[in-house]
C-alpha cells in the first residue's frame, strides 16, 4: 500500500511539474510574441491645424506699442501609437512598460505675417511699417512614434 501511495504521489508531482513547464512555456511564448512593437495600426501623422496667434510688441520703456493677430495654418502631430504592459521577472514592479507617443521627428522654422495690427487704444494701424508683423515659429515637418520620455535630436 505504501508503494502504491508513493507511486501515485510521484506521478502527481511529475504531472504538476509538466503542467508548470507547459504553462511557463506558453507564457514565455505569449510574452515573446507580444513584446515586438507592432507598427501596423499606428496612425501618428503630420496634420494641418488652424490656430489664432496674438503677439504683443513693447517699446524700449516696456510700454505696449502694438498688438497683432491672425489665423495661420501650421502642422501638428496627431495619432495613436501602440503601448503595452507585460509581466516581467526582471523589473521590480513585476511589469515591463513600453509606452510610445506621437511626436515630431523633425522641425522647421517658418516665417509668418500677422496682418491685423492695432495700437494700444485698439485702433487698426495702417502705415506700412506697423500694419503687419513678421514672426517666426517652429512646426513639425514629420511625426512618428517615439518611446515616451525619449529626447528628439
Swiss-Prot record:
TM helices/strands, residue ranges: none
Signal sequence extent: 1-35
Disulfide bonds: 44-102, 68-117, 77-143, 81-145, 99-148
Gene Ontology MF annotations: G protein-coupled receptor binding; neuropeptide hormone activity
Domain CTCK: 44-139
Keyword annotations from UniProtKB, A to Z: Disulfide bond, Hormone, Secreted, Signal
PANTHER family xref list: PARTNER OF BURSICON
Protein name: Partner of bursicon
Species of origin: Anopheles gambiae (African malaria mosquito)
